[in-house]
Amino acid sequence: MNTKLNVKGYLNVGDNHQLYYWTQGNPNGKPVLYIHGGPGSGTDEGCLKYFDLETTWIILLDQRGCGKSKTNDIFYENNTDKLVSDFEILRQKLNIKNWTLFGGSWGSALALVYAIKHPQVVDKIFLRALFLAREKDWSEALMGLGKMFYPYEHQRFMDSIPKAYQNSYEQIVNYCYDQFQNGDESTKEKLAKAWVDWESTLLSPINKIHSTATDFKLVEKLALLECHYAVNKSFLDENFILDNISVLKNKSIYLAHGRFDLICPLYQPLALKQAFPELQLYVTNNAGHSGSDANNLATIKHLLKTYL
């Protein structure tokens, strides 16, 4: 019997935001909230590749300003507290008492923030490519190890920024943020494409990955929202996750992290492991940031099959 369910709809969360959500899998199975990354990437069918849809009910939501969600202003009331609140609104709408969280990269940070604020409704937490969402983590993602491994690609990104604004991470992101909000369309498009191309370069040291978004609006959303959250330091206290992770001392947290992750280097999961010794950390060899790297994908599937 086919137990898969495909439900789609829009969630009115106020603030002129209508959020697209959909479910896949077995509605009688274990509910798992899939929290996408970026910020700004949205969800698609590829997000389902980690899961057994015969035993799991996957709930997916395009965050504010992302994917198929609707708004007249992607920046308005778009912050971490609001995203966390949106997950709660969705959980209540779907009449889910408790659910498991799955998040990668930015989605891993959101999963931990949500769990810290709502531990009573969280069963287990599965993460990949941990991002702690501190200012130094944003700086590392944009201006860290990657430029040493891919100097020519990094220079192409820098060429999209006037030399007067290239002296520091702060100058770069503030220039980009100003242009994304106030620049002419030509400058905005050039800058957004350069931002996403640079990030795509860093996704995998194993498989060369290029930006596959042919719709400029999708590229623009990713660049604008990543910059928005970077400039605003994730709308979190600098060490919010590490300072509050002890709230989850009775929760099982599983993390698969690529050894060669150039966007979220290994120092971040090691910091979480130090603050939360109960963390089940699996460092995947010959893998980077991408969840599609073979060893990352195999490890994530193993963790979900074994411990979910």
Curated annotation (Swiss-Prot):
It is found in: Cytoplasm. The keyword Repeat does not apply. Its EC number is 3.4.11.5. Coiled coil: none annotated. InterPro entries: AB_hydrolase_1, AB_hydrolase_fold, Peptidase_S33, Pro_iminopeptidase. Residues 30-290 form the AB hydrolase-1 domain. Pfam families: Abhydrolase_1. One of its GO terms (cellular component) is cytoplasm. GO terms for molecular function: aminopeptidase activity. It catalyses: Release of N-terminal proline from a peptide. Keywords: Aminopeptidase, Cytoplasm, Hydrolase, Protease. One of its GO terms (biological process) is proteolysis. The active site is at residues 105, 261, 289. Its main location: cytoplasm. Specifically catalyzes the removal of N-terminal proline residues from peptides. Belongs to the peptidase S33 family. This is Putative proline iminopeptidase. It comes from Mycoplasma genitalium (strain ATCC 33530 / DSM 19775 / NCTC 10195 / G37).
